[in-house]
């Protein structure tokens, strides 16, 4: 059992016998009212999304999920096929099932992902916390105002845009933190 105040993005709870993924959780406490947790939830079986407000003391059922290591095998249209690294079983997911990690999934990636199963059905895929990607396009370095942390826009091979340090050039390999939508960490070593 979890309480409402323990909810955070990535937590899975059971509502009406279905697993629901917490995509966003915002804790609010006002002086007059009790503390509340505003959440955005996604049904892992149907893809339906909703917003629910919980009291900090509400009791919620945990969901036990199975996890296996998998790698991206290939992409066909909006279907992403992942392969279990131990028994080589293939699993398919639609783009909408993995929309939170989609900006960092690209053909030919070698990252070992975590395939998430609910009752023997693949419902989601989680990327490692840090991934390495190649910068496909970025502007040249800015001259002059270089005191402090200077950032500029860059584009990855799959079209994802993010801000990188000013010294990063086209073709450089960068590290990306995949939590909370992904952010530049530094040049890959």
Curated annotation (Swiss-Prot):
Keywords: Cytoplasm, Elongation factor, Protein biosynthesis. SMART domains: EFP, Elong-fact-P_C. It comes from the Bacteria. Signal peptide: none annotated. One of its GO terms (biological process) is peptide biosynthetic process. GO terms for cellular component: cytoplasm. It holds the Pfam family Elong-fact-P_C. It is found in: Cytoplasm. Pathway: Protein biosynthesis; polypeptide chain elongation. GO terms for molecular function: translation elongation factor activity. Belongs to the elongation factor P family. Involved in peptide bond synthesis. Stimulates efficient translation and peptide-bond synthesis on native or reconstituted 70S ribosomes in vitro. Probably functions indirectly by altering the affinity of the ribosome for aminoacyl-tRNA, thus increasing their reactivity as acceptors for peptidyl transferase. This is Elongation factor P. It comes from Pseudomonas savastanoi pv. phaseolicola (strain 1448A / Race 6) (Pseudomonas syringae pv. phaseolicola (strain 1448A / Race 6)).
């Amino acid at each position: 059992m979890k309480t409402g105040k323990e909810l955070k993005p990535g937590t899975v709870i059971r509502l009406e016998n279905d697993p629901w993924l917490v995509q966003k959780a915002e804790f609010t406490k006002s002086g007059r009212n009790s503390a509340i947790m505003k959440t955005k939830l996604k049904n892992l079986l149907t893809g339906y999304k909703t917003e629910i407000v919980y009291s900090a003391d509400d009791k919620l059922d945990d969901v036990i999920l199975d996890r296996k290591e998998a790698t991206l095998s290939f992409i066909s249209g909006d279907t992403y096929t992942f392969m279990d690294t131990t028994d080589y079983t293939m699993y398919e997911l639609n783009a909408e099932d993995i929309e939170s990690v989609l900006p960092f999934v690209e053909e030919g990636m070698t990252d070992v992902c975590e395939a998430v199963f609910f009752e023997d059905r693949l419902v989601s895929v989680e990327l490692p916390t840090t991934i390495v990607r190649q910068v496909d396009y970025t502007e040249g370095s800015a001259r002059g105002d270089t005191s402090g942390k200077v950032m500029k826009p860059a584009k990855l091979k799959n079209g994802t845009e993010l801000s990188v340090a000013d010294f990063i050039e086209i073709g450089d390999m960068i590290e990306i933190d995949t939590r909370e939508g992904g952010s530049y960490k530094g040049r890959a070593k």
